[in-house]
């Protein structure tokens, strides 16, 4: 994610330490395979979400200061988590806590996952059914439920509704793709009057941004197909039933944009964030985790709202936001008993302490699935929108990232989408990457099982 950051961020397979944004705490030197001298064990967390790297480092330092337990945090560079995890797990000083994206990612690391059934963090879940399980074994704990959609600038939408001939009088009237397109097209035509550069922020395909499209946007047509066909476990093949709808929304992003398609390959996540925060665009596809960056760029809580991503599917007026988890925490079963216990204690502290609750809910902007967060009112307006949406009675779109056969499937899809956007590829190439390559990547992932 991501979140990510998320809810999954990928491309450029630069492997090794060069690809790691390494963040160690309290100036600790590498400590080999041994535990801390006082026998407390130590913690090494390999974080998946680059957008929360600094926050995890700060939180871990607080824990070290409080308990004396060494905590190291490293964050894999965008798009390199699987390669980085493989490299790090092969070392004597391997991560004691790592992440998988769900059932598919778990298959790669099932030999490394400890049973978390008796841990504090598992017992703090509001609903234990959402834990990642393998038979009776609890192998992963989701620590963030991420919600995403089309973030909109309330001030710009209000300004638009006051223009002569505006297609809506209130943003609540946008409840379908047709209405979204009508409004976006009109805003694009009146961009000079509105003082914007485009209705939508740039659809950047730099690795800091492409996950918004090859994973998050692709999830919408997948979700409709899976719902229609009653799919609940990873399918060997898909049909691409809603690919025309996928094209609808992607074309709209390209046409009513701040940026020419020829420039998208180098456009970053920061570019889109900046365009939106500066009022250069009214719409920005992203999620609850984006608030920290928007706030840092000067936006106020009452300036933002979030719409569902409409694609022209039947009944979408009852569609809510997209929500789910692709962030499951696992503990390395091959770490020493002392390090495993230290890691379990650290995670329990993260979800039960005032410091941890504040870090996850405020500093990282997460919506979390733990009992200890029930009374937390988030300062993140996008989280509040997500909470309201969950109570609205609308059908939320499931996050099917964990069903996607591989990171490579996303990468190939992203490359085909960029080529289509730039005019060097066709939509049929996107179809092949979406449908045909699903089977290829599924077969590759299951070849040794």
Outline where the language-model segments fall.
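Extracytoplasmic/periplasmic solute-binding protein
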Residues: 137-143, 148, 178-234
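Glycine-centered hinge/linker elements that transmit conformational signals in sensory
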Residues: 182-185, 228-266
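Extracytoplasmic/periplasmic substrate-recognition and gating elements
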Residues: 258, 297-364
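Short helix-initiation/N-cap motifs at beta->coil->alpha
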Residues: 75-84, 175-179, 263-278
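Conserved N-terminal structural module of periplasmic/extracytoplasmic solute-binding proteins
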Residues: 2-4, 8-105, 118-121, 316, ...
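Short, solvent-exposed loop/beta-turn-alpha elements that line the ligand-binding surface or hinge
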Residues: 117-130, 169-173, 204-207, 222-248, ...
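Conserved C-terminal helix/tail region of periplasmic/extracytoplasmic solute-binding proteins
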Residues: 368-369, 375-376, 391-449
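Hinge/lid segment of periplasmic solute-binding proteins
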Residues: 101-158, 305-307
